[in-house]
Protein backbone atom coordinates (compact mmCIF):
# COMPACT_ATOMS: atom_id res chain seq x y z
CA UNK A 1 0.00 0.00 0.00
CA UNK A 2 1.63 3.27 -1.04
CA UNK A 3 2.07 5.87 1.67
CA UNK A 4 3.57 9.29 2.12
CA UNK A 5 4.58 11.52 5.00
CA UNK A 6 3.13 15.02 5.25
CA UNK A 7 5.01 16.92 7.95
CA UNK A 8 5.06 14.08 10.51
CA UNK A 9 1.66 12.63 9.52
CA UNK A 10 1.75 9.26 7.72
CA UNK A 11 -0.90 9.12 4.95
CA UNK A 12 -1.82 5.73 3.46
CA UNK A 13 -3.22 5.64 -0.08
CA UNK A 14 -5.74 2.88 0.70
CA UNK A 15 -5.23 1.04 -2.59
CA UNK A 16 -2.69 -1.70 -3.07
CA UNK A 17 -1.37 -0.52 -6.41
CA UNK A 18 2.38 -0.52 -5.80
CA UNK A 19 5.12 -3.04 -5.24
CA UNK A 20 8.32 -2.41 -3.41
CA UNK A 21 11.23 -3.69 -1.41
CA UNK A 22 13.18 -2.99 1.74
CA UNK A 23 16.70 -4.36 2.02
CA UNK A 24 19.57 -3.65 4.34
CA UNK A 25 22.48 -4.97 6.30
CA UNK A 26 24.02 -3.92 9.61
CA UNK A 27 27.63 -4.42 10.63
CA UNK A 28 28.66 -3.99 14.27
CA UNK A 29 32.14 -4.21 15.72
CA UNK A 30 31.85 -4.47 19.48
CA UNK A 31 34.70 -4.52 21.92
CA UNK A 32 36.24 -3.46 25.17
CA UNK A 33 39.09 -1.15 24.22
CA UNK A 34 39.30 -0.44 27.94
CA UNK A 35 38.45 -3.34 30.33
CA UNK A 36 34.87 -3.31 31.70
CA UNK A 37 33.65 -0.64 29.27
CA UNK A 38 31.43 -0.79 26.19
CA UNK A 39 32.57 0.52 22.83
CA UNK A 40 31.28 -0.17 19.33
CA UNK A 41 31.01 1.07 15.77
CA UNK A 42 28.16 0.29 13.37
CA UNK A 43 27.64 0.66 9.65
CA UNK A 44 24.14 0.28 8.21
CA UNK A 45 23.37 0.10 4.50
CA UNK A 46 19.68 0.31 3.56
CA UNK A 47 17.41 0.71 0.55
CA UNK A 48 13.60 1.07 0.45
CA UNK A 49 11.75 1.82 -2.77
CA UNK A 50 8.30 1.36 -4.24
CA UNK A 51 7.40 0.90 -7.88
CA UNK A 52 4.30 2.91 -8.79
CA UNK A 53 3.04 3.83 -12.27
CA UNK A 54 6.35 2.80 -13.84
CA UNK A 55 8.50 4.90 -11.51
CA UNK A 56 10.87 3.73 -8.78
CA UNK A 57 10.27 6.07 -5.84
CA UNK A 58 12.25 6.10 -2.57
CA UNK A 59 10.02 5.49 0.45
CA UNK A 60 9.97 8.05 3.28
CA UNK A 61 12.15 5.67 5.35
CA UNK A 62 14.88 5.35 2.69
CA UNK A 63 17.94 6.27 4.75
CA UNK A 64 20.66 4.76 2.57
CA UNK A 65 23.49 4.63 5.11
CA UNK A 66 24.28 5.33 8.75
CA UNK A 67 27.54 5.23 10.72
CA UNK A 68 27.55 5.29 14.53
CA UNK A 69 30.39 5.19 17.04
CA UNK A 70 30.21 4.79 20.81
CA UNK A 71 33.37 4.89 22.93
CA UNK A 72 33.80 4.70 26.70
CA UNK A 73 36.95 5.18 28.77
CA UNK A 74 37.88 5.71 32.41
CA UNK A 75 39.82 8.73 33.60
CA UNK A 76 43.52 7.84 34.09
CA UNK A 77 44.27 6.25 37.46
CA UNK A 78 40.67 5.67 38.59
CA UNK A 79 37.63 3.59 37.72
CA UNK A 80 35.23 5.96 39.50
CA UNK A 81 35.08 8.46 36.64
CA UNK A 82 33.97 7.40 33.17
CA UNK A 83 33.78 9.41 29.93
CA UNK A 84 31.65 8.47 26.91
CA UNK A 85 31.52 9.75 23.35
CA UNK A 86 28.83 9.04 20.77
CA UNK A 87 29.02 10.10 17.10
CA UNK A 88 26.34 9.62 14.41
CA UNK A 89 26.25 10.38 10.70
CA UNK A 90 23.39 9.26 8.46
CA UNK A 91 21.90 9.99 5.06
CA UNK A 92 18.97 12.40 4.91
CA UNK A 93 15.43 11.13 4.33
CA UNK A 94 13.55 11.75 1.06
CA UNK A 95 10.74 14.34 0.84
CA UNK A 96 8.46 15.68 -1.86
CA UNK A 97 6.02 18.54 -2.15
CA UNK A 98 2.46 18.10 -0.83
CA UNK A 99 -0.02 16.57 -3.28
CA UNK A 100 2.96 15.21 -5.24
CA UNK A 101 3.97 12.50 -2.78
CA UNK A 102 4.53 9.89 -5.45
CA UNK A 103 6.11 12.22 -7.99
CA UNK A 104 9.67 12.13 -9.18
CA UNK A 105 10.45 15.58 -7.79
CA UNK A 106 11.42 14.28 -4.37
CA UNK A 107 14.53 15.61 -2.65
CA UNK A 108 16.53 14.60 0.40
CA UNK A 109 16.93 16.37 3.69
CA UNK A 110 20.51 17.16 4.73
CA UNK A 111 22.50 14.38 6.39
CA UNK A 112 21.90 13.72 10.10
CA UNK A 113 24.96 14.59 12.20
CA UNK A 114 25.27 14.43 15.97
CA UNK A 115 27.89 14.20 18.71
CA UNK A 116 27.14 13.49 22.38
CA UNK A 117 29.58 13.50 25.27
CA UNK A 118 28.99 12.36 28.84
CA UNK A 119 30.76 11.96 32.15
CA UNK A 120 29.74 9.65 35.01
CA UNK A 121 30.86 9.16 38.61
CA UNK A 122 30.44 5.77 40.32
CA UNK A 123 28.61 6.32 43.62
CA UNK A 124 28.34 2.63 44.59
CA UNK A 125 30.67 -0.21 43.57
CA UNK A 126 29.56 -3.71 44.59
CA UNK A 127 30.99 -5.45 41.53
CA UNK A 128 33.55 -7.61 43.31
CA UNK A 129 31.73 -8.25 46.60
CA UNK A 130 30.76 -11.86 47.33
CA UNK A 131 27.25 -10.84 48.39
CA UNK A 132 26.51 -7.48 46.78
CA UNK A 133 23.71 -5.20 47.90
CA UNK A 134 20.67 -4.74 45.67
CA UNK A 135 22.71 -2.78 43.13
CA UNK A 136 25.94 -3.84 41.48
CA UNK A 137 26.84 -0.24 40.57
CA UNK A 138 25.23 3.18 40.84
CA UNK A 139 26.42 5.93 38.50
CA UNK A 140 25.64 9.65 38.58
CA UNK A 141 26.17 11.30 35.22
CA UNK A 142 25.84 14.41 33.12
CA UNK A 143 25.64 14.49 29.32
CA UNK A 144 25.71 17.10 26.62
CA UNK A 145 23.48 15.86 23.80
CA UNK A 146 23.99 17.31 20.31
CA UNK A 147 27.24 18.89 21.52
CA UNK A 148 27.74 21.09 18.46
CA UNK A 149 24.09 22.23 18.31
CA UNK A 150 23.58 20.94 14.76
CA UNK A 151 20.16 21.69 13.27
CA UNK A 152 19.05 18.26 12.04
CA UNK A 153 15.92 18.31 9.87
CA UNK A 154 12.98 16.19 11.07
CA UNK A 155 10.43 17.19 8.41
CA UNK A 156 9.32 20.13 6.29
CA UNK A 157 6.38 22.49 6.65
CA UNK A 158 5.20 23.66 3.24
CA UNK A 159 4.14 27.26 2.62
CA UNK A 160 2.37 28.32 -0.58
CA UNK A 161 2.52 31.95 -1.69
CA UNK A 162 -0.12 33.86 -3.70
CA UNK A 163 1.42 32.74 -7.01
CA UNK A 164 1.05 29.07 -5.93
CA UNK A 165 4.82 28.66 -5.45
CA UNK A 166 5.67 26.23 -2.61
CA UNK A 167 8.52 26.68 -0.14
CA UNK A 168 9.87 24.06 2.25
CA UNK A 169 10.47 25.34 5.78
CA UNK A 170 12.45 22.82 7.85
CA UNK A 171 11.30 21.52 11.23
CA UNK A 172 14.38 20.80 13.31
CA UNK A 173 15.08 18.18 15.95
CA UNK A 174 16.27 19.24 19.40
CA UNK A 175 19.31 21.45 19.65
CA UNK A 176 21.97 21.15 22.33
CA UNK A 177 20.62 19.70 25.59
CA UNK A 178 22.16 19.03 28.98
CA UNK A 179 20.98 15.86 30.69
CA UNK A 180 21.58 14.58 34.22
CA UNK A 181 21.06 10.91 34.94
CA UNK A 182 21.44 8.24 37.57
CA UNK A 183 22.04 4.63 36.48
CA UNK A 184 21.38 1.59 38.66
CA UNK A 185 23.06 -1.66 37.57
CA UNK A 186 21.67 -4.91 38.93
Task: Set out the residue ranges of the language-model regions.
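Residues that define the transmembrane beta-barrel architecture of outer-membrane proteins
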Residues: 19-23, 61-67, 111-115, 136, ...
